[in-house]
Amino acid sequence: MNSKVIHWQDFDLSAFGIAKNLQEKHNCDLFTIIDIPNRPKKFFQEQSFVKYQKKWFYHDHISPNKKPDIEYLKYIEKNYKIDIWKIAYNDRIFFKYNDFYKFTSDEVLSIIEQSCKLFENVLDEINPDFLLMPVTNSGRMHIFYEMCKAKG
């Protein structure tokens, strides 16, 4: 049976090159969460360099203006040992000095909740053996890393 590798793809294409090389040299099934804006999305939808078993486009799973489920977020903090507000305060998008948009507390929690639900669904569906990602550079990426680590 092939190893299952979940790959986090963002704007840094070096991870994409590593995934391609990994697939060429090892028997593994690659899955990916693609965290990019809509403009470059078409490339990842149509590319044939890396054959992913399944891919999730992160932004397709995030909707604005949803009321956060506080009980679910407490469950995430407890089961995965994640301090949600600590991560949110350090996120470059939610950061209080972001001049482009000021997120409300509900917006922040809603986005984090939707992210966690996506990540839980992905991890439950594929049960990966390995995680391939660069150093975390966003709150959502760090939450995914922590959830993978907690699941073992």
Give the predicted meaning of each segment:
Residues N21-Q114:
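Conserved N-terminal ligand/cofactor-binding loop architecture of enzyme catalytic domains
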Residues W8-N21, Y80-G152:
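Active-site and donor-binding regions of nucleotide-sugar-utilizing enzymes
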Residues M1-V5:
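Extreme N-terminal starter segment of soluble prokaryotic enzymes
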